[in-house]
Every structure is written in C-alpha cells, then in structure tokens.
Amino acid sequence: MSWQQVAIDADSRIAERFADTLMELGALSTAIEDAAAGTEFEQPIFGEPGEPVDRLWEQSRIIVLFAADADVAMLIAAAAGEAGMPTPVYTVEAVESQDWVRLTQSQFDPIRISGRLWITPTWHDAPDANAINLALDPGLAFGTGSHPTTRLCLQWLDANICGGESVLDYGCGSGILAIAAIKLGATDVTGIDIDPQAVQASRDNAVQNQVTAAFGLPDTLEDGRQFDVLVANILANPLRMLGDLLASHVRAGGRIVLSGILEEQAQELSELYSAWFEMDPPVFDEGWTRLSGVRRA
C-alpha cells in the first residue's frame, strides 16, 4: 500500500501554522526541514529534547504525509484558506507503507508538557519513570502532543483536574486528552469523534495506557448528558456550529476548554461562547489559542 508524500516550500513565518492546519485537516504526519539542506546555505538549528525550538530556517520545506486516497489539492487549498495565505506550489510522490512507519516514528520523541506530565511514543522508553507518562501511538488520528493546541489543552487539564471529575473529550482524535484526564484523576471520561479510525486509535491508546474510557461516534453520546469538564480541540468552523450542542453537555458551574483556534479567531469565538459561559482570557501558543470558561446556571 502506498501513501502520498507532499513537499511544500514555505516562508518560515507561516510554515508551522500551515503544517498545523494540515494536521487538523487530516494529514497523517508533518515535518518541517531546512529547504536549503544539503547546500552551502544550510542552517543548523538544534533544540533540547522534548522542548519546541524557538526558531526555524529562513526558508522551510514542509513534508506532509497523506493517505493514498486523500484529495491533496483540496486539503492544501483548505489549509491555505484557514491560514489566510495563497495556495502554495507543491510536489507529490508515492511512498510505500513501510516508509510511512519509519518516517512517522522518527518524528515523535518524548515531549514534556509540564513538570509532571510527559507524552511518550510507545516505541520510546519513558524519560521520567516518576512522572505521569502518556504512552501514545498516534495511529491515523491527530493529537500527538507536539501540536500547540494539544499542548494548550493538556496544560489546562494538568492545572485544573483535581480528581473525581467527569470529562467529555469532543473530537478526541488519538484520545490523548481523555487519557490524560484519567491519569490526572478524572473518574468518568468519554471521548467522541466523527472518524471511526480516530475512535479505534483512542481505544487502542487507552489499552496501551491501562486506563478505561468510553470512546464512540457522536450518536453514542446521550442527549442532555452533562459533564464537569468538556474539552474540544477542533477547528474554528466546527466550534462555531457546535456551540449550542457543546454547551448543553456542560453542567452549571462546569468548565469548557476550546482549541484549534487561530489567534485572530479568538475574539469571535470567545464572544460566541459567552452566550453560555463566563469566558476566561485567551491563552496563546505559536499562533494558536485556548479558550476556557465556566457554564452559567
């Protein structure tokens, strides 16, 4: 079985945002490298393991992996629209499945989220046996911990889950947020996604982490069921459409956490959700936003 590998040369000022948006839209993996690699203009850049680098090359190349049947042209055009940029020039080549496994695994090293929380790929040893380690197989769903929106949500959960909460992860992807909530002390956790592959990846990752959560498609979520915490790390457009539904699943006094929102979309989404929630100030990370708030009675 083959996959589609796409190479996109991009200005480094927009490379990360564009790669992030492609992941949100269903890319299997992304990597950013020096567009001048192997030439006299190559720029070595190094960072600490588990920590994001604070700069990129002057000109970057985004390497993106898509499923064989993905509509690459449509996805790249959609990502360009979300990122507010023209559709870039790109090349596409087929790679065999064994190359995809190697390329994907080589991207994911352990990631430190906080002083006590790490994301560790299943093929790595845990870097800190005394920390809360989330063993993750990204599978075919977004949510590896390296994306700023995932990181923002994990940091909120780490700071706010006290123990015993019920949590709904709406748009669960790989299940990373639901699994983190359980390991941080939540006792009743549900994950919902529209993609059956994401649901299966979430279930597999829960087994890998030796935790129990209920993962399913949206029609498995009971109407009117309410939770102490709802986290939704999805794109701005679905968040616009789902406001009333998401609010209905948060109890009075409960908390909502939203991400997948570009910085310039934050005010609009915060104002929209203020119809149901007392909204906190937004938190930003690499051009992305986390919104949170408390459900009014």
From Swiss-Prot:
It catalyses: L-lysyl-[protein] + 3 S-adenosyl-L-methionine = N(6),N(6),N(6)-trimethyl-L-lysyl-[protein] + 3 S-adenosyl-L-homocysteine + 3 H(+). One of its GO terms (molecular function) is protein-lysine N-methyltransferase activity. The gene is prmA. Methylates ribosomal protein L11. PANTHER family: ELECTRON TRANSFER FLAVOPROTEIN BETA SUBUNIT LYSINE METHYLTRANSFERASE. This is Ribosomal protein L11 methyltransferase. It comes from the Bacteria. Its main location: cytoplasm. Its EC number is 2.1.1.-. HAMAP family: Methyltr_PrmA. Pfam families: PrmA. It is an enzyme of class 2 (transferase). NCBIfam families: prmA. S-adenosyl-L-methionine binds at residues 150, 171, 193, 233.
